[in-house]
Each structure stands twice: as structure tokens, then as C-alpha cells.
Amino acid sequence: MSILVIGGAGFIGRRLVPILAADGHAVTCMDIDVAGAAAAFASLADKVTIVRGDVTQFDDVIGAVQESGAERLINLSYFIGDLPPHVAFKLDIQGMDNCFEAARRCGVKHAVFASSLAVSGPQDYFGERLVDESDERRGESQYAVNKITNEWQAHDYRRAYGMVITCIRPANVTGPDKKFGSIDHVNCMCQPARGQSVTFPHADTRRCVIHVDD
């Protein structure tokens, strides 16, 4: 199967691409960081095709879909944290729309994108009970609200065109090489292992973590 992974050189993509290649899929990684992708997948040169592309540019996205002959598209391209609003909109919202529209025009059979547990908002809204996908989305940060918007975009494309789009809401993805976004949970595990102290910004900080390899 031909799979296009957009943002494949990122924290999650670096793990996902080799798994897909090992399963026998024809994988294309589109990323703005071609050098990083080449380094990450150096041992998979005969199994992974790397193309430079900017998710905010529709021509880059649809070009990658067409060139790869993608049957499946996975979008992992995102900024973790806050950006100036105009920049955040282009990357997080317009970028996602570019992926969905390119998938629609090219007849991609299945699109997958990473949303986030952040869409639910703080646990305080729900008390001590478990939160699931049927609960109200109460995220308030730029990151969370943009993810909520992405979920609405996916719903709109499914409604309008009957597309198959899967949204995944990971928890706080953790791993020793995570450098951006919420890294307090990374520091909590890694710094003591290195003999270093760890500091949390708030005494009542709570995280729901999942290892990146999972």
C-alpha cells in the first residue's frame, strides 16, 4: 500500500515511518526538514521516499499525493505550543485543510490525522471520572482549539464528500528525545535518571502520558 506521511521527520513520524516500511508499505515522507528526514531514515533509503514539502502550500501537498500515488495519507505536521495567530492558522488549520482537500481531489482512500487529548480541556471540568470521546471538548489553549477545529474540518469533509477520515487523540506523548511542547513529563523521568533535579511549574501539575513508541 502507498502511504504518504506528512511531517514524517517529526517526533512521532520518526517512529511511525519505519514501522510502516517494515510492514511492507511504500512510504513517502513529506517534510520541510529534508536533511532531518534523510538522517532519520538513512537505513531505509530503499524503502522510504523523502520529498520536501510545506504543508501550508497546497501545491506542495497535492504534488506529494500525486507523485507518491498515495492510497493513505497521514498528517502529523503541527506546531506544539503557541505561535502568532496568523502563523498558527496557516500551519494548523490551513495545513490540515490542504491535506483533506488534496486527499479528496486525488481519491485517497483513507486520511488519518493526530488530534490530541488537549481538546478535552482540564480534568477539573470532569471531576474524577474518566473522559471519553463523547464528552464535550473544553480545551482553551491555541493548540487545543486548533485541534478542535481540525476535528470539525474532518467532520465537514466526511459529511460533504463521504471521505474516510480517522482522528486519533493521543495523550501527552513522551520520550527522551522530545524537545518541544509539554516536556515536564519527559524531564520528570529523564532528569532524575541522569542524576539531575526536576522542577514543575505548578505543584498540582497532572499529565496523562503515553510513550511515543506506543
Model-identified regions with their sequence ranges:
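N-terminal Rossmann NAD(P)H-binding glycine-rich loop of SDR-like oxidoreductase domains
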Residues: 4-23
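Conserved glycine-rich Rossmann-like NAD(P)H-binding loop of the short-chain dehydrogenase/reductase
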Residues: 25-36
